[in-house]
A protein has these predicted regions:
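Amphipathic, non-transmembrane alpha-helical scaffold segments
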Residues: 5, 13, 59, 63, ...
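Helix-turn-helix
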Residues: 11, 15, 19-61
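N-terminal helix-turn-helix DNA-binding core of bacterial DNA-binding proteins
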Residues: 24, 34, 102-103, 127, ...
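Amphipathic alpha-helical packing segments from all-alpha helical-bundle domains
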Residues: 67-68, 86-93, 106, 119-143
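N-terminal intrinsically disordered/low-complexity leader segments
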Residues: 1-7
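Hydrophobic alpha-helical connector segments
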Residues: 57, 72-106
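Solvent-exposed, charged/polar functional surfaces in cytosolic regulatory/catalytic domains
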Residues: 36, 61, 65-76, 94, ...
């Protein structure tokens, strides 16, 4: 089976995301990520040229997953009711169920972790977060 580096890239991202949620973006140094992911420095920099590139990849992955969760929940709510108010209540209920199933330690919100340190985050990363918040608002207001 050919190696394309996807597993290693995902491992680095998983470690970095957990670290950012635990100690913030500033506390998640490249060196700490390298150590915890058990990869070489050259491997890290093969996948991410800078810490900013890693941060951007993390938020893009998080936003993609968030978008899928959101759309799945909204689709289910729309299938269960035609009434917009009921759809909204079902949608909120689905998210409550999802959060009730989370096990400690709770993963946290990458958007919030980044926004706490917005001065250390680039405009493009903040734009991704803003885009997702606007998507949520627009989609809920359609209901």
């Amino acid at each position: 089976m050919p190696r394309d580096g996807t597993l290693t890239r995902n491992k680095i991202m998983d470690v970095a995301q957990n670290m950012v949620l635990d100690v913030g973006l500033s506390g998640a140094s490249v060196e700490k990520v390298i150590d915890e992911a058990d990869v070489t420095k050259s491997t890290f920099f093969y996948h991410f040229k800078t810490k900013h590139d890693l941060a951007a990849a993390l938020i893009e992955r998080y936003a993609t997953d968030d978008r899928h969760h959101y759309e799945d929940a909204m689709e289910k709510a729309e299938q269960l009711s035609r009434d917009p108010l009921q759809q909204l209540l079902i949608f909120v209920g689905l998210f409550i169920e999802m959060t009730d199933k989370l096990e400690e330690p709770f993963p946290g919100c990458l958007y919030a972790a980044y926004c706490y340190q917005s001065g250390a985050i680039s405009i493009d990363i903040m734009s991704t977060i803003k885009e997702m918040m606007l998507l949520w608002r627009a989609r809920v207001s359609e209901t």
